[in-house]
């Protein structure tokens, strides 16, 4: 799999207003009808040589970009298991540096290993570290008293010690090169993956979109007053259910400019080919409606959306053109 950037405005079959704002779409697939690799996965994915589930955002101070990916088994072992994540940063969206965390190596990965409690007895039996995402937490306090860190949340499975995928979180420092020992975010008694957290000004709560493995298919929502704890079970009567019994995952919620409502992108992967779709939600991230396909995306995987400036977009177009010469 290669990481690729669609440098064209993403066009939908309907709702043309999307094309004004969805300027940057980072995704991972075997082949793409346009553009060039944004980076070489074999260089940055040091465990398996492949990447998936890319989540990109700006640094907390606006001075650059950070990205986190699943180090995915799509090149070397080609097994379903994977063992770690990759943290990347860039000043220009073109040149990236990275660090890789192979969770099979255990506590040596984590900067607080001397004082933290390990969630596992044996890290060598880890089976999955999936779909990491980032949320800047200005109130997080490090052991040295410094405040502010990037909360990275993801699902993990260690079959030797737990029965199903559960959501965990670590904190990365401001250099985006160190992470803390994973802590359990919640356990609802069944498998959960592909969490997407946003803070909503409309109600002052954190909202999480998440896929439940088992039960009724769909993308569900849960809320909390706090970022890293207090997550109750998801709402059962208001969820992304347009696909019926077909399976969907990989949700990403975002807002358009000058609009307090939300859009939710997700993958419907039961069909062949898969569909990357976007639906609407109200300002409380509820009442999902009007799903449409994203046009021109083949073989979609779990991606993310980030608003960029006109200048950034033009720079990317120039870079894309130069690489194609």
Language-model-derived ranges and their functions:
Residues 1-325:
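Carbohydrate-active catalytic/glycan-binding domains of CAZyme proteins
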């Amino acid at each position: 799999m290669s990481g690729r950037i669609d440098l064209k405005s993403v066009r939908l079959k309907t709702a043309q207003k999307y094309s004004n704002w969805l300027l940057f779409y980072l995704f991972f697939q075997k082949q793409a009808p346009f553009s060039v690799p944004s980076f070489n996965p074999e260089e940055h994915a040091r465990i398996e040589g492949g990447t998936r589930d890319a989540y990109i955002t700006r640094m907390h101070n606006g001075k650059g970009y950070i990205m986190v990916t699943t180090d995915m088994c799509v090149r070397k072992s080609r097994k379903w298991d994977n063992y770690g994540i990759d943290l990347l940063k860039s000043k220009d969206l073109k040149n990236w540096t990275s660090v890789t965390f192979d969770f099979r190596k255990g506590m040596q990965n984590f900067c607080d290993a001397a004082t933290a409690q390990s969630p596992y007895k044996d890290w060598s039996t880890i089976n999955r570290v999936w779909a990491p995402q980032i949320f800047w937490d200005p109130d997080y306090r490090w052991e040295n008293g410094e405040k502010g860190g990037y909360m990275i949340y993801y699902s993990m499975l260690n079959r030797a010690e737990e029965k199903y995928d559960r959501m965990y979180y670590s904190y990365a420092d401001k250099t985006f090169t160190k992470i803390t020992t994973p802590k359990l975010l919640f356990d609802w008694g069944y498998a959960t993956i592909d969490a997407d957290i946003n803070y909503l000004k409309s109600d002052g709560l954190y909202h999480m979109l998440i896929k439940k493995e088992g039960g009724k298919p769909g993308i569900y929502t849960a809320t909390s007053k706090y970022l890293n704890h207090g997550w109750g079970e998801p709402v059962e009567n208001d969820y992304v259910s347009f696909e019926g019994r077909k399976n969907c995952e990989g949700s990403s919620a975002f807002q358009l400019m000058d609009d307090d409502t939300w859009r939710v992108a997700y993958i419907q992967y039961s069909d062949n080919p898969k569909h990357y779709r976007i639906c609407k939600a109200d300002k409380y991230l509820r009442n999902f409606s009007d799903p449409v396909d994203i046009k021109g995306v083949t073989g979609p995987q779990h991606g993310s959306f980030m608003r960029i400036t006109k200048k950034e977009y033009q720079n990317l177009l120039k870079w894309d053109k130069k690489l194609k010469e």
